[in-house]
Each structure stands twice: as structure tokens, then as C-alpha cells.
Amino acid sequence: MSESLTRIAIVSEDKCRPKKCRQECRRSCPVVRTGKLCIEVNPTDRIAFISETLCIGCGICVKKCPFGAINIINLPTNLESEVTHRYSANSFKLHRLPTPRPGQVLGLVGTNGIGKSTALKILSGKMKPNLGRYDNPPDWAEVVKYFRGSELQNFFTKVVEDNIKALIKPQYVDHIPRAIKTGDKTVSGLIKARANNNNFEEVMDHTDLQNLLNREVGHLSGGELQRFAIAAVATQKADVYMFDEPSSYLDIKQRLKAGRVIRSLLATTNYVIVVEHDLSVLDYLSDFVCVLYGVPSMYGVVTLPYSVREGINIFLDGHIPTENLRFRSEALTFRLADASDEITADRTAEYNYPDHVIEQGDFKLTIKSGGFSDAEIIVLLGENGTGKTTFCKWMAKNSDLKISMKPQTIAPKFQGTVRMLFLKKIRAAFLNGKFQSEVCKPLSIDNIIDQEVLNLSGGELQRVAICLALGMPADVYLIDEPSAYLDSEQRIIASKVIRRFIVNSRKTAFIVEHDFIMATYLADRVILFEGQPSRDARCNPPQSLLTGMNTFLKNLDVTFRRDPNTLRPRINKFDSQMDQEQKNAGNYFFLEN
């Protein structure tokens, strides 16, 4: 196999604009100058074409392109023989496929844009893998022959014979109401029309949909839509169940309940596949894990299956021992939560807020007085609908301190690029070198700085919103769900960015967060919200991380232990020996190594 094939050229469809440039890539290419057609592009073309067989990998076109549309990537080892799918010339390609096993839950872990959703489409039979031959795709017989000798051969044979029924819970649940055009639009009508798994009542109980059965789907909130989507899939009989990010929008209690619903679908003959960015939920759900690595929206590679603990640790470590390959320059680590006490001595200013009762329609929130100091992060913990966002808004309205708030839902209305938005809203911070290196650079804002705000994806918008919130000059930062839409890697980076910024600028932050790993990483103290969601809730005064988490987890009836290698929190399986020991001792949350 020639060496040139281990290199791929990617041309971004969004950025490449031959009409607006002088074809610098073609003019500067040394291979074109020798008379070979390595780069073909004319002002009338939609996109440039780069021949990967002729390309010598000099990287001149990458530097010359005025729009930064070209990337030349040297692949690790020779993966050319293992291409599963490629969309078109100079576009994303996926290597290998995850191997589902009957009667077990397969978890997929990897960053955004690395091919997890593509892999799900292929395994569900909704897309035929073209083995990299996008111009001359193979037929199914050839695909099955290609996978011979692996566990996927039997799987694809069933797909070809139409013996397999696959159901996917989509990633973006907020698109569901638009897809439902006619007929009964109520929750119960839509689920009952398809339900054939004899578990309707049980699933309704576990997903807390009993009170919403007569409501129209168009009137559901994000968390309710997520539970509806999980229930709609779980009440149908199928051979393959696929859940794409089943925990977004849900609070910690609902995440664990959803996890139990998904695990209840297992039978000896069916397959369950889950894509999840909340690592503690993925850990709780899966029996084994495939890690995906590569360069987002350029290429993705699926590893062999690992045990859950080993797979997640490999992803965090950035190094695959079986392939002797490092795919990330540094490991993602967790500090121990009690190591935060080093900075307590420096805290000077103390602020207090009074007892207060807020009533909004049927909902009543009783706030107990409390206080906070500077250089401190307080995480608000509680179920959805217990008034965490209401508390943030009340703080913003009734305090003399300057407050910057990142709302829970981000609806962009700004006409223009990200750069224009930053220069308009947070000019001083954006032009400050320290803010650039501590906030913008780690959140990789550079990659999207010249894109239109209205065209950004959920994760990109979230990163822009975090930058905007931290860039405003304020005494108190209220950040509502900073982890939504971010992948596991970005979540850890975002929590490090927020923590470093708050401590260095000696400000206070109140953060609402449902991702357990992120909440424990960020919190110095916690405020617990208890009571009946949407009816009557109570906001307790701030308490230490250990006592707060212990009380919170006791209400959820869940215990956590720490992984000895990476120190990340792991959920104990319900009623396991460890679970019972910790409950008897009253230790629901562990801090020691």
C-alpha cells in the first residue's frame, strides 16, 4: 500500500468559496506546477477538489487558503484498509464500526463530530456503508463479505434480510414537535399508537409522564420531550434500540430513572446502543464501551470494545494501550473536590441574602437566607422545576451587585458573526490577552469566530454563551446548565475554564448543573433545592460539598465511589455490595482516594 494513502485532505464545504478567492491553493501547489492535477478548482466551482493520491502533504495550500478551508491530515498507522464509510471526496470518513453484542448495552464515547451518529445510522440499516468508495458504492453482498469473520457479519446479514427492526431516539429532541404533522398530537395518543411491548404503564411510571398524557407534544419542555422520546422508543418491540444522548435536558434523578428504563429493555436476543456525554450516566448504563477518536468532522476511528471502566479511562487518558496510540496531547484529569480549600483563606468579602418567598401562579419557592464570599463557586442542586432558575433570576433582580447571567436556553437572534457579537457585547474582555488565553482559546472559539451566529450548532452556541457570560464585568456570575450540548471533553475543559476564571478574578459564581462529574468538579459549596417540582419547593442555605452531596444523594437513593486511577465519581450499581455498605455507613458521596 503506497504511503500517500495514509494522508487525507479535507475541504470544508462551509468555508471553501472559489468565487471569492483567487484559487491560491491551486496556484501555490508544487504538484500542480509539475503539471499534475493535484488540486482542481475554478471560480465557477462550488468547492475545490484535492487528489489524495497525488498530494505530497507539503501543507502549502493549508497556509495559503484565505478562508482556512483546507486541512491535510496524516492518519495514525495505515487505516486505509479499514474505511467503513466516506460521504464524498475530501470529506469526513469513518474507520471501523462499533461491535454490538446481544443482551448487553454498548456505550459509545467520543467528542462531537467524530462519527457516533454516522455509526448509529449504519448499524440501524438506515445508511449503507460504502467502504470509502463514494463514487462506486458496493452492494450489500459485498458489504457482508467485507465484514466476514467478525461479529458484524451476522449482524449485517440480518440487516440485509430485513430481519432486524431498529429504533433510534434522535439526538435533538427539540425537533420532534416539527416532525409531527397530523393525527393525535397528545403524548398518550402518539405513544399508544406504536406501543406493542406490554410495558406501557411501567415505562410511564419510570419516565414520570403520567401527568402529561393528555398534553400536546408541541407544549412540552426540553426535559419532558426527552422523556417522551425515550418512552416512545421503549414501549415498542425492536431488535436494536439506539439512544443518542438520552440524558440532555434531564436532571440527575431523571437521568438515573431513564438509565433504568434503557437497561430494562435488554433481552438475550436484542441489542442496545447508547451514545452519552455524561460519563457517570454512561458508566451506569453500559456493559462495555467503544471509544471513538480522530479529528472532529475530518475522520473518526472506532476502537475495539473495552470494559466500561477501562474504556472511559482510556478516553480520559487520551492513550490507547492496545494500539499504542496517543490521540490527545494531555490527559483529562479531575481534581479532588476537597483540594479546593487551599483558597479559602484569601476570601475577604461576605455577601448575604435574606429569607424570601416567591410565588408564580401555582408554584411557591421558599428561600432560606444564606451568604457567599468572593472567589467561590456555589452549585445549585435539585430536580427540574424546583426553582433553581427562579432563584437565579431573583438574585439578579434584587441584589445591588452587578450580575452577569448565562440563561438555560440559548436562542440566538444576533445577525452577524461571532466576532461581531463579541466586539459588540464584551469588547474590553475580548481584546484582553489574558481573557483570550484563559477563556477563548481553551473553548476553541477561534474555529468558529468568523461563522454566522445563527448557523452555529448547539455545542458551539453553548461555548459562545459561556464566553459572553464570563466576559461581562460583574460581581456575581449566574451560569445555568453550562454542560448542555457539550461533549465529554468540552465539559471538563469548560469546567476548568469557569473555575480558573472565577478564582483568579475573585468573583462569585452560582452554577446550575446536572452533569454530576462537572458539578463535583466545580463546587466549593452547594445549595440544595428540595420539595415538590412545579408546586412547592424549598431553597436551603449553602452547605459544604460533602454534607450537601450526601443529603442530595440520600434523597436520590444513589451512592458514588471514586475511580482509583482518574478520581472521577462513579455510580454504584443499585443494591451491589458497595452500594449497601456505603448506605449502611451513611457515606453516599466519597472524597478520599
UniProtKB/Swiss-Prot annotation:
**Which is a Gene Ontology cellular component entry for this protein?**
cytosol
Record-given protein name: Translation initiation factor rli1
Question: What's the main place this protein lives?
Answer: cytoplasm
Swiss-Prot/TrEMBL GO biological process terms = cytoplasmic translational initiation; ribosomal large subunit biogenesis; rRNA processing; translational initiation; translational termination
SUPFAM superfamilies the record matches: 4Fe-4S ferredoxins, P-loop containing nucleoside triphosphate hydrolases
Instruction: Locate the residues binding ATP.
Output: 110-117, 382-389
Q: What does this protein do?
A: Component of the multifactor complex (MFC) involved in translation initiation. Required for the binding of MFC to the 40S ribosome. Required for the processing and nuclear export of the 60S and 40S ribosomal subunits.
Question: Assembly and interactions?
Answer: Component of the multifactor complex (MFC). The complex associates with pre-initiation complexes.
Enumerate the UniProt keywords alphabetically. Answer: ATP-binding, Cytoplasm, Initiation factor, Nucleotide-binding, Nucleus, Protein biosynthesis, Repeat, Ribosome biogenesis, rRNA processing, Transport
Q: Which residues form the ABC transporter domain?
A: 70-318, 334-556
Q: Where in the cell is it found?
A: Cytoplasm; Nucleus
Q: Which InterPro entries match?
A: 4Fe4S_Fe-S-bd (IPR017896), 4Fe4S_Fe_S_CS (IPR017900), AAA+_ATPase (IPR003593), ABC_transporter-like_ATP-bd (IPR003439), ABC_transporter-like_CS (IPR017871), P-loop_NTPase (IPR027417), RLI1 (IPR013283), RLI_dom_1 (IPR034348)
* SMART domains on file: AAA (SM00382)
- The membrane-spanning stretches of this chain are none
Which residue numbers delimit the 4Fe-4S ferredoxin-type domain?
7-39, 46-75
State a single Pfam family of this protein.
ABC_tran
Q: Which family does it belong to?
A: Belongs to the ABC transporter superfamily.
From what superkingdom does this record's organism come? Eukaryota
Q: Name one GO molecular function term.
A: ATP binding
Q: Which organism is it from?
A: Schizosaccharomyces pombe (strain 972 / ATCC 24843)
